[in-house]
Amino acid sequence: MAESGGSSGGAGGGGAFGAGPGPERPNSTADKNGALKCTFSAPSHSTSLLQGLATLRAQGQLLDVVLTINREAFPAHKVVLAACSDYFRAMFTGGMREASQDVIELKGVSARGLRHIIDFAYSAEVTLDLDCVQDVLGAAVFLQMLPVVELCEEFLKAAMSVETCLNIGQMATTFSLASLRESVDAFTFRHFLQIAEEEDFLRLPLERLVFFLQSNRLQSCAEIDLFRAAVRWLQHDPARRPRASHVLCHIRFPLMQSSELVDSVQTLDIMVEDVLCRQYLLEAFNYQVLPFRQHEMQSPRTAVRSDVPSLVTFGGTPYTDSDRSVSSKVYQLPEPGARHFRELTEMEVGCSHTCVAVLDNFVYVAGGQHLQYRSGEGAVDACYRYDPHLNRWLRLQAMQESRIQFQLNVLCGMVYATGGRNRAGSLASVERYCPRRNEWGYACSLKRRTWGHAGAASGGRLYISGGYGISVEDKKALHCYDPVADQWEFKAPMSEPRVLHAMVGAGGRIYALGGRMDHVDRCFDVLAVEYYVPETDQWTSVSPMRAGQSEAGCCLLERKIYIVGGYNWRLNNVTGIVQVYNTDTDEWERDLHFPESFAGIACAPVLLPRAGTRR
């Protein structure tokens, strides 16, 4: 660093330096007398300083302390150690007796670790391998050399593999390295079954094994394989056998195949001799034998291993006069933030304008049409339940009436089908499905016949808006159903009339989106979006849609509303657009595209098993 005072000194300052990298351009200022003052910087100075200190160390010059470990000596400069390490700074400047000693014996670190630490202090470099890294990391933590700790963490993350993962995890625990621990956990969740084949797995502490087995983050793991891994760990040490139920309670036996339970689980002594393990097995058999009572048997062992909801779509139609076909495809958007849909499975029968509702992560699929009709003559009464873990369809009791362009919602553990139309015309009837009895029964009818409406449940009540009724005002109407009183009442109407639109609840609000408005012999897209607050019985307008969508699928996924496909009346055609509305920011985000241009799509948020667990 150089400073020059006076106007003439500043002009000649740059040429006064000798060989080597030139100085950076000076920062110049002038004082009130006009004198020029320049500050120069030599970028290579810190490197030169380190090199000079390393040379002094190598030549044994100006050394003022010797650190010893097990009779191995490490000469150094106190000022260098104090500048790099909080531990040494406190030792040499904090009034400790070591400050005046020439030879200091260190305890708590290895000689190999200290050698790497001192080399780093003089070079800013450390050479690591799997053989030495634990010694170096231990020394860096003990001597409070944060840069070396961070370099060791970086190395260990890069060295992570099926073979090294658990050992690295032990280091992360020993030295309280949260970031490294998170990396180890994430790697283990992705590769658990491969890691379970390693010898290190058999030495995994009980609490760590339980941590992994109880998690929803395990990927590509069938429950039968997790069971086998847990049994292998238990059988490694006979002293572990009394803890069998503590470990195996985290295996989700009800989600196994029946053949796996019979052939691979109940045949093991441990599952018969341990009282709690016998209960887990009985729970699994009961769960599978009584599918209509599975809602009553929900427990941590019946939950799908996933904590990220997927958007799942069902059916749809291309809506052309020449093609009356409907789709049987089921697509998924794997997680919020994903950009592309992929095929998940197929429905037993193709369907469009079906309605879906989710209860305990089972998807109820009801009504719709199996051939594309412009009117209600193709309406069906069929009802199915989709189990996302076993990828299995269960045919349920049919509805009392065929329905299309109706609503299906879950309320208080029951599934409600409201309104719609069929071959006989529009409907005011409301049906209620009891999962335990597998029966549909009638509830209080709507106040008037309605089809093409939208619905959402919120706060223990069911809300129905818009649709075709008997007057124009019905297209703005809001009906509210109280299941305790079994009665409907009108609430404040929407600001915009709309039919064939969507409703979804989010954060105590109920949003009405999309749809169309009829005018004489033409139809127009409704772009306006508004939300209803039940506590105040008021509607509020928010940012409008960018493109029209009616007869579209709609659902909430982590506080964002997805509107999938449908019909665009400005283009007079079906669309494959997926518009995404952020309820937190009142903004429409970048559009997605559905694989097909379909109307009559139904969609719902569903927890799906992480990749590789569906069979």
From Swiss-Prot:
Domain BACK: 165-266
Kelch repeats: from-to residues: 310-361, 362-413, 414-460, 461-508, 510-559, 561-608
BTB domain ranges (all copies): 63-130
Disease: Defects in KLHL26 may be cause of autosomal dominant inheritance of Ebstein's anomaly and left ventricular non-compaction.
Entry protein name: Kelch-like protein 26
Entry superkingdom: Eukaryota
Stretches for region Disordered: 1-35
N-acetylalanine modified-residue sites: A2
Biased composition, class Gly residues, residue ranges: 1-21
InterPro entries: BACK (IPR011705), BTB-kelch_protein (IPR017096), BTB/POZ_dom (IPR000210), BTB_POZ_KLHL26 (IPR030588), Kelch-typ_b-propeller (IPR015915), Kelch_1 (IPR006652), SKP1/BTB/POZ_sf (IPR011333)
CDD domains: BACK_KLHL26, BTB_POZ_KLHL26
Species for this entry: Homo sapiens (Human)
Function field: May play a role in endo(sarco)plasmic reticulum (ER/SR) mitochondrial signaling. May be part of the ubiquitin-proteasome system (UPS) and affect ubiquitination and degradation of target substrates in cardiomyocytes.
Cysteines joined through disulfide linkages: none
SMART domains the record matches: BACK (SM00875), BTB (SM00225), Kelch (SM00612)
Record's keyword terms, sorted: Acetylation, Kelch repeat, Repeat
